[in-house]
Structure formats: C-alpha cells, structure tokens
Amino acid sequence: MSATAISDLFEKPAQFKNKKIKLTGWLKNKRTSANIIFLEVNDGSTLLNLQAVVKQDQPELFALAESISLASAVSVSGTVALTPKSKQPLELVVKQINVLSTARADYPLQKKEHSLEFFRNNAYLRVRARTYFAIMKVRSLLSQAIFDYFFKNDFVLVHSPILTSNDCEGAGETFELKQGKEFFNKTTYLTVSGQFGAECYAQAFKKVFTFGPTFRAEKSHTSRHLSEFWMIEPEVAFANLKDLIKLIESTVKTVIKQVMQKAKQELDFLEKQFDVKLMERLKQITSTKNFHVLEYTKALEILKTAQASGQANFEVQDFNFGLDLKTEHERFLCEQHFHNQPVFVINYPKDFKAFYMKQNADGRTVGAVDLLFPQIGEICGGSEREGNLEKLVERCQAMQIDTQTLNWYLDMRKWGYFASAGFGLGFDRLLAYICGLENIRDAIPFPRAHGSINY
C-alpha cells in the first residue's frame, strides 16, 4: 500500500471515511492516558499533524506506541474515522506501526518552547519546528510566485555567474576567491549582483530577470543584513524610471497576493506566532492603489520638519543634500508620514550611488529609486543605467574605479545600447516582511553573517 499524503486527508476528509490507509512521516507529539495513546504524525505535506489513535485493546501495539520517541520516523497504517465535532475533521485508528528509524532520547527539539535564538544556533534542525516549517514553506511559495510573475509577463530567465572578476556595486565589500589569480589568472570574487549579466542579455531579449544568491562582505551584526542572500534582479531594455516604478509595484503586489492565497494556512499560523496584524498589513500593501512616489529632496524636507516640530527625534539629523537615508528615516516616511504605506524615493544624489546609474539633467542626481516598506525600510533598489559611453567612463574616473575588468561592460555601449533599467529586490527581506519576522536570519535556511557560518 502506498502512503497517503496528510494534506489530501485534510483537503477532502469525507472521501477517506472508513478507508484503510498508510502514513509515513515523523512523530511530532505523543499523549498518553490510561486507555489510549494519541500519536501526532507529520509527513511534510502540510503544517498540520494528523492524530493517530492507538487503543489499549491491542496490548502489543499499545506498548510499541508507548515506546516510540519524538522525531522517530514511522509508518502507520489503519482506518480513517471522521471526527466532525473535534478540532480535526478526521483521525486514524491505528492497526499497525512500523518504526523505521528511532530518534535518540537526546533529540534537541523536545516539547518545551524554544527561543528563536536557540533555533538560529540549530539551523540544521529548526525546519522540523512548526514555525520554521511554515516560514520555509512560504519561502518556497514566494519563489514560485516570482517565477510565475516574470514568465507570465514574458521575461527570460538568465543564470548569472557566481564567480566574477568585477565588483558590480563598486563598494569594495566583496569576498575574494583565494585561488582566483592562480586558477583564472585574475582576481576573482563572489558576485554581489547579477545585474551586469542581466544587462547583457536585456540587449537581446529586452526583458530578463535573474534570481540567485549574492554575497557581501559587510561586517554587519544587524537583524537586516546577511553575507549571503538571494536577489531578484529584472532588467528591461528601452525602459525609464517611470517604467521601472510600475514594474516594481506590480511585481511586489502580485507576488504577495499569490502567496496570501497559496500559503494561507502558514500565514495564519505565523500571524498567531509573531504579528497579530500580519494579514492586515499584507492586504494594505496589495490593496493600495498606487505606492507613494517622493523626490529625495522632498524626503529631506519632510524629515527636517518632523525633527524641528518634535514629531521625531532622529539619531542622524543632518538633512542637507547628500544624506544617505538611514533606516530610521526610511521607516518614519513609511510608518508615520504616509501611515504605514510603501513609498518610492527617487532621484538620489549621484555621490553615494553606483557608477552605472544614469545622471539626470541637473548634474547632481541620478535616475535611481528605492522602495521603502513599513517595519523594514529599503526593500528594493533600482535605476536607469547610463547608456552614454563617455559619461560612463567619466563617472568611473571620478570614482577612481579601475575599468580594466569592466571593458566588456563599457563596450556594450558601443553597439546599440540605447537605454536599460532594472532593480534588485531582496528576496529574504521580502520574505521576512511577509512572514512578520524581525530578524532576517529567520528567513533563510542556513544564514551566513559576519562571524557565523556553522553549516
């Protein structure tokens, strides 16, 4: 007899009434009384455990059930009984149990409650806990939503390289490969972005996207930063800043809406765990007609006024042109000024933005955009790309960027490169927002951060 999925049982319980079935999974919980043992089994198909009942009128089976340790792998066979008056619509009346693998008594995840910090230190086991099971299921469904959106809108997927000879962002926060010079005959890094590869392919396919891991050697110890994280990076030829803003908003709203539909069970569970207003927040994002769009200079005025009036008390209070907005500023704009709504900030000073961003006519700003979210701050950043070769070279020189490894990127401008625009959306940050997580390390299976790489 092949195993039945627990998710199928809960989806259509009436179809399984009085049927003999087999389950394979793990023992998640066990309750014993004088005459009956309740085994809670999970097979990974759903967040819910199925209750399997062992009665005392089968002494050998009862004794076996009593001896099974938590986390043991089991095969359980029996007859389905409907229980419409109970919390669950059905249960399994057990006739046979096979213990496939016995978990030792020192299994770390016992019945008691564990802190999130405990789980972060035991990342290889934490997905067995319901909280992380739910988070990682949402992660999978969010990934699916990303692919569904871009394929439905005729984007071509580009597999950008992990190893690279350049620092895309020009910030110097890269991991250098120890054997790079010896093996490749030049300095080699782990990629900080798939953008450059996407730009190349956008000049052929027009609309492309990358979705993969990126690496930053930032020695940050905040709840918002990882050294290895996943990025969604679309790139569109002939697009401008207005086109980009529309694409970002459409992407974010659509994928969140799809996850809300497909991961309702998991999100309801996480709402009870972390955030009583989780679904309300997500609905507010998806139902907002248009995200607010704010000029960088206007953002400075709002922040300066808020500080002067006593509405806010920022740690960083220098609101002169050239301020790189901090998280406290970004969150104030979203949460206080715009009443918990997303905000696009556009046209930033060129001095702290990347060399490849297209300069505006004013000579001091670039066509860049950041999407700010409540509770998080920046979740997405993008720009128009500089299409003029001479201007791009001048910008590299002004920023003292060695163009030896960028010749191919510059050369693209020689042959039909009219315009391009793209953005990078932090997948893990978006997931953390959707799940109501305060620490991004809870949003990725095996978090890597400064001083922490245990697996």
Curated annotation (Swiss-Prot):
One of its GO terms (biological process) is asparaginyl-tRNA aminoacylation. The keyword rRNA processing does not apply. The keyword Oxidoreductase does not apply. It comes from the Bacteria. NCBIfam families: asnS, PRK03932.1. Signal peptide: none annotated. It catalyses: tRNA(Asn) + L-asparagine + ATP = L-asparaginyl-tRNA(Asn) + AMP + diphosphate + H(+). Homodimer. Its EC number is 6.1.1.22. Pfam families: tRNA-synt_2 (PF00152), tRNA_anti-codon (PF01336). SUPFAM superfamilies: Class II aaRS and biotin synthetases, Nucleic acid-binding proteins. GO terms for molecular function: asparagine-tRNA ligase activity; ATP binding; nucleic acid binding. The lineage of its organism: Bacteria, Bacillati, Mycoplasmatota, Mycoplasmoidales, Mycoplasmoidaceae. HAMAP family: Asn_tRNA_synth. This is Asparagine--tRNA ligase. It is found in: Cytoplasm. Belongs to the class-II aminoacyl-tRNA synthetase family. Keywords: Aminoacyl-tRNA synthetase, ATP-binding, Cytoplasm, Ligase, Nucleotide-binding, Protein biosynthesis. GO terms for cellular component: cytoplasm. The gene is asnS.
